[in-house]
């Protein structure tokens, strides 16, 4: 079951609450409220999404957490993004099916001037019992507080949780922050889980940790060879092939 996470310290979460209207209170657990949106439990806490630490509450309600959040970037533009969180070298559990379904839905509902993207794995929280997926609106206060923008996010969420395409579960190693393999996701060739960006220190241990934290077994890995130098590249390829993973070298 999906679990929605809203953070009162986050402007997009607050706008989402404004767009959706009242949600019935089911119970209070510690300092978080559990409410209901459609058929989905909603956990509401007072802090920022990256500060969330009540994973045990999420685990009691479902398996797949979706965090509604703002997106920020150095050169702001209207953006709808999705990604798995993780503060390297550790990461959250990634849900390739959900990340990819949300990306396809975001690109389907996106209207001018919004663009859509899958981001590399970055920032907390790190989960171990449930998968975590961040669904974001960017990249300035104008978009964060826009009912129209957050309405697009809401529409994508409702589209994605219906299910749909199931493609080859794939992790990506050495890519840019905004992944360059999005077209493969849109075509239904792959479902993307963890994306290890080129700017982190890529080691065999980092790749192993990411590989192990997915909701489904990884069947393919796309590795950008220019961004993963030997001997690490050879170690990573050997490890993945030993797991039965189809390794695709790019770049």
UniProtKB/Swiss-Prot annotation:
GO molecular function annotation: D-aminoacyl-tRNA deacylase activity; zinc ion binding
Membrane-traversing stretches: none
Pfam family, one: tRNA_deacylase
EC number: 3.1.1.96
Top EC class of this enzyme: hydrolase
Keywords: Hydrolase, Metal-binding, Zinc
Cofactor annotation: Zn(2+)
Catalyzed chemical reaction(s): a D-aminoacyl-tRNA + H2O = a tRNA + a D-alpha-amino acid + H(+); glycyl-tRNA(Ala) + H2O = tRNA(Ala) + glycine + H(+)
BP GO annotations: D-amino acid catabolic process
Record-linked InterPro entries: Deacylase_DtdA_archaea, DtdA
Note describing how the cofactor binds: Binds 2 Zn(2+) ions per subunit.
Residue runs in coiled coils: none
Function: D-aminoacyl-tRNA deacylase with broad substrate specificity. By recycling D-aminoacyl-tRNA to D-amino acids and free tRNA molecules, this enzyme counteracts the toxicity associated with the formation of D-aminoacyl-tRNA entities in vivo.
Family to which the UniProt record says this protein belongs: Belongs to the DtdA deacylase family.
Quaternary assembly: Monomer.
Protein name: D-aminoacyl-tRNA deacylase
Organism: Pyrobaculum calidifontis (strain DSM 21063 / JCM 11548 / VA1)
Phylogenetic classification of the source organism: Archaea, Thermoproteota, Thermoprotei, Thermoproteales, Thermoproteaceae
Protein's gene: dtdA
